[in-house]
From Swiss-Prot:
Lineage: Eukaryota, Metazoa, Chordata, Craniata, Vertebrata
Sequence positions bearing Phosphoserine: S330, S332
Listed GO MF terms: G protein-coupled receptor activity; phosphatidylcholine binding
Purpose of the protein: Receptor with constitutive G(s) signaling activity that stimulates cyclic AMP production. Promotes neurite outgrowth and blocks myelin inhibition in neurons.
The protein, known as: G-protein coupled receptor 12
Amino acid sequence: MNEDPKVNLSGLPRDCIDAGAPENISAAVPSQGSVAESEPELVVNPWDIVLCSSGTLICCENAVVVLIIFHSPSLRAPMFLLIGSLALADLLAGLGLIINFVFAYLLQSEATKLVTIGLIVASFSASVCSLLAITVDRYLSLYYALTYHSERTVTFTYVMLVMLWGTSICLGLLPVMGWNCLRDESTCSVVRPLTKNNAAILSISFLFMFALMLQLYIQICKIVMRHAHQIALQHHFLATSHYVTTRKGVSTLALILGTFAACWMPFTLYSLIADYTYPSIYTYATLLPATYNSIINPVIYAFRNQEIQKALCLICCGCIPSSLSQRARSPSDV
């Protein structure tokens, strides 16, 4: 096991480099004088192509969200600021995956490795922290429904944004500032050049934030069910209608949290138990679903939002469909 390759987010895994060595190529191509002495062909790891494709899709989706929020003055409420933060973080994460692919095959150096891994760590950290901030905002908007739209809430939102981006940037700077395994391979994690300790801190931090999000969503479910019951009593809804509305709201919350866990939990747990000696295919197989979370985020948090849908329609066709303008919010719209 000690000779298995490790994933290098800023360079080719060793198995791919070995596959492109001259002796391997000469076995497949007949020796013809100068051809046999030419440089080996560039061998591209299919996993890296998939990660780059995922990064491209992430950039396209989240760029649309960032442009909508930036272009629409009406989308300046705390909720939209946090959604914009999430979209910007995911946009940078997708850009980091693309840059990683370009640098890994065209411009390899220690500096590019550190800058690329720093960008990826900072952007994905900001993405996860933004998800936590959105969860906190949703909880506060329900728990303090009467005083939520106040100047105090806006100030609190800006404080959260400064803290989450400041923390994420600091985490991204750690490899650049010297906390990396470029000089000591034995300290490498499953993702080079991150150290094992660095990866462990990131994984434990994720588990802590996931536990906090789980607790907040449980409280949100309780509030949603209570609100749905009160609305049903006020409007004399049937018990079946109350049940359907509540179930829809709880199902939405379960889908949000379940998607987040399914995308990030495999890579988080694998980073805790594995090290650089493990086969790289396991790292790729757990890292790829984590990138899918940045693909799904715009669908869950942005494109499902009624106000963002209206802004998108105004930008694209200059009008708002009647189905959007007449739609009323329900307790399931969380």
